[in-house]
Amino acid sequence: MIVFGSPHRYVQGPGVVALIGEELVRLGRSAIFVAEDGIWRMISAQITASCQQAGVAGQHVRFDGEVTRAEIDRLYAACVSKVPDIVVAIGGGKTIDASKALCTRLRARMVTMPTIASNDSPTSHIFVIYDEDHRLVAVERMPANPDLVIVDTVIVAQAPAILLSAGIGDGVVKQFEVEQCHRAGSNNVFGGRGSIAALALARACYDTLRRDGSAALAAVARGTPDSALENVVEACVLMSGLAFESGGLSICHAMTRGLSAVKGPAQALHGLQVAYGLLVQLELERREAAFIDDMRRFFAATGLPVSLGELGFNGTSADVFTIAELTVQAPHARNFERSLVAGDIVAAIEAVETGRHLAGVA
């Protein structure tokens, strides 16, 4: 059985925040805007004017920065007395996840407005919840994907370049993970088989990022969107998001379980973690040295890590084994063409760190 899921509508371009009123009125007449205070101050005037013109009543609810049960309860208490038709998340991944949790409790329509392109959470129905010490406590799901994703590339172009690098890292891995899921016969996050469309999107995402990644980072350095940035934002947010949910994930994302358990890598952005995970996965796939070396050059050109040290790691061999052990315990590690043990991950990490590739090793 094939299952493919996606947002109902996706809008991207320079200045599209001014269109939010006419987009929201398709979904309802009242909205809660969940955003950190700094983000809200930056764009509230445009949103308010657009909503007033469209006849959409809006209210800002402050997001305090962490996706905890307590924060979700606080957000819920702020709007439960007058339940809105729509919850609009404005900001990064944490704001979006907290808003997804709120939307699920309110049974409202869901809109995401990412202000950065560091990951593909805006299109997905999945959200994560942490405890007060930032330990993962739950991975939960909305009943469906967001009703609308709206991405203003003028705003994205003004964010720090490292955030776009992280988005490139999160996107570039998807082709290889979806391909592994196909080879392993694994299900996607919807519980069905990955489709030809999901694989095509993953490959288009990779091709776009390889072609336009460096130019898009140059656009961010200038603070002005251009065609390269438009292409890369579409790849990082839309193509990558559709590919991972409908195609599946593998070793790159399994590595985040291990990397998040050791000092240094644990503090790295998700997209940087999974990018390093791709180098490990390519070694496990026994890719040719020339292919891996080419990937490493692309990583260096786009601000992605080519070693554990570049993720902030300064640990021991015992820490490397911890990374490996937690990686093979992650559910996504089963989505690989053969069964793996911790020793396989250690060997692949050592190959990445030393440059002594595993291709041709029995």
Functional labels for PLM-detected ranges:
Residues M1-I86, L308:
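ATP/NTP phosphate-donor binding region
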Residues I2-F4, L24-R26, C79-K82, C103, ...:
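Solvent-exposed alpha-helices and their adjacent loops that cap or buttress functional pockets
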Residues V17, W40-S44, K94-A101, N119-T123, ...:
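Short glycine/serine/threonine-rich phosphate/pyrophosphate-binding segments
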Residues C79-L102, L106-I116:
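A short, small-residue-rich loop immediately preceding and capping a beta-strand
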Residues T104-A197:
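A glycine/threonine-rich phosphate-anchoring loop and its flanking beta-alpha core
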Residues V189-A301:
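Active-site segments that bind and position negatively charged phosphate/pyrophosphate groups
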Residues R287-A362:
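C-terminal charged capping/lid subdomain of soluble metabolic enzymes
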